Amino acid sequence: MSPQTETKASVGFKAGVKDYKLTYYTPEYETKDTDILAAFRVTPQPGVPPEEAGAAVAAESSTGTWTTVWTDGLTSLDRYKGRCYHIEPVVGEDNQYIAYVAYPLDLFEEGSVTNMFTSIVGNVFGFKALRALRLEDLRIPPTYSKTFQGPPHGIQVERDKLNKYGRPLLGCTIKPKLGLSAKNYGRACYECLRGGLDFTKDDENVNSQPFMRWRDRFVFCAEAIYKSQAETGEIKGHYLNATAGTCEEMIKRAVFARELGVPIVMHDYLTGGFTANTSLAHYCRDNGLLLHIHRAMHAVIDRQKNHGMHFRVLAKALRMSGGDHIHAGTVVGKLEGEREMTLGFVDLLRDDFIEKDRARGIFFTQDWVSMPGVIPVASGGIHVWHMPALTEIFGDDSVLQFGGGTLGHPWGNAPGAAANRVALEACVQARNEGRDLAREGNEIIRSACKWSPELAAACEIWKAIKFEFEPVDKLDS
């Protein structure tokens, strides 16, 4: 570099390290309708001011780095940088703050959850100046959400495909989850579907293992679907898990499912990855397959209250990436899930427009415009005594999934399915008659037992089963 060039380049540039807050903390900033907004729970290291911590998050998740660089002068940082525009302390917690960050839309590739997360929840989560960091919520502007296809079909299209209206759908995860042969697995599916369920399901870790290769499982499950449909006159389905070691293999399995004529496939969207999930969602839209999503690995990311990412963010990401169902906790079963918090992200999955509501953990108003909704799936440690609460909590647009609560029936799989179907129909009828499911639920179930011996046997076997543990991740008081 010539001396003259070096002198010119030095104008406006001062090498060294400066506080992030000088550039990235902008409390005067007014957010734009096109900004992606993020709410981070920040726990700074001792001696780090909250403004500096919030600014560091904005910087490290957008245009910043640890020192001033020459190439800052070759672009417009004011146009592209993230901005920490507001910080508030977390009530009841020492040294925790909610830092609000606005990101310009041009920082993100259109239609790519992968790119969005690589920026917003990338290296910044290992930043030494922060003791812990959690992404609590995102506001996705319509200008960005419209670049995504979203769910392959959505709630109304699924209802029309199944010709089932006015009640939650019923499912069952086949157990034991690992070890059955394909033929015995298919037999269990058939018995559950014939007994009254709408769906049966592969467990999340059923892929293509030595005891049951995927193609054999697909064939026997398809046989179970067609046989049970012929006997009941209802449309049935089985969530065939297409998750695989490569995207190419995953699509190959989905193609085979389509050739068999089954209505739905399944994907583990976190372990499989967002790129693979979006590819599968596009294939399902183009080929008339519904897509069930399992959230295996979510608790690694979302369970700790001060670090990671809340499930409401993962739920929004799934709606963008694509899925027609997703597991969303039960409130009453064996898996983590506080009621108001769970209903908050259930609404984010199903509804078109959701108002900001901090009482339910919703930090931003979210407008999905015309993106189809996702059906929440309640699954994990539930049985017939839970049916009134589940019907009241989740409403009609949900899947209530009883694995052990079907297959653990003392008389077998088909009676277990019948017990669940009778319990559901009784609860829906009682609700439609104006009865209070929360107050009269047990009485409704006991009355139905009088004309359903299958339900009576199920009620007897599970009458004392409860999962009474305090949730780890609770709303701030």
Swiss-Prot record:
The keyword Transcription regulation does not apply. The disulfide bond which can form between Cys-247 in the large chain dimeric partners within the hexadecamer appears to be associated with oxidative stress and protein turnover. The disulfide bond reported in 1WDD may be the result of oxidation during crystallization. GO terms for biological process: photorespiration; reductive pentose-phosphate cycle. The record marks 334 as: Transition state stabilizer. It is found in: Plastid, Chloroplast. Its EC number is 4.1.1.39. It catalyses: 2 (2R)-3-phosphoglycerate + 2 H(+) = D-ribulose 1,5-bisphosphate + CO2 + H2O; D-ribulose 1,5-bisphosphate + O2 = 2-phosphoglycolate + (2R)-3-phosphoglycerate + 2 H(+). Keywords: Acetylation, Calvin cycle, Carbon dioxide fixation, Chloroplast, Disulfide bond, Lyase, Magnesium, Metal-binding, Monooxygenase, NADP, Nucleotide-binding, Oxidoreductase, Photorespiration, Photosynthesis, Plastid. The active site is at residues 175, 294. Residues 1-2 form a propeptide. GO terms for cellular component: chloroplast; plastid. Pfam families: RuBisCO_large, RuBisCO_large_N. The keyword Nucleus does not apply. It comes from the Eukaryota. One of its GO terms (molecular function) is monooxygenase activity. Gene3D superfamilies: Ribulose bisphosphate carboxylase, large subunit, C-terminal domain, RuBisCO large subunit, N-terminal domain. Binds 1 Mg(2+) ion per subunit. This is Ribulose bisphosphate carboxylase large chain. The lineage of its organism: Eukaryota, Viridiplantae, Streptophyta, Embryophyta, Tracheophyta.
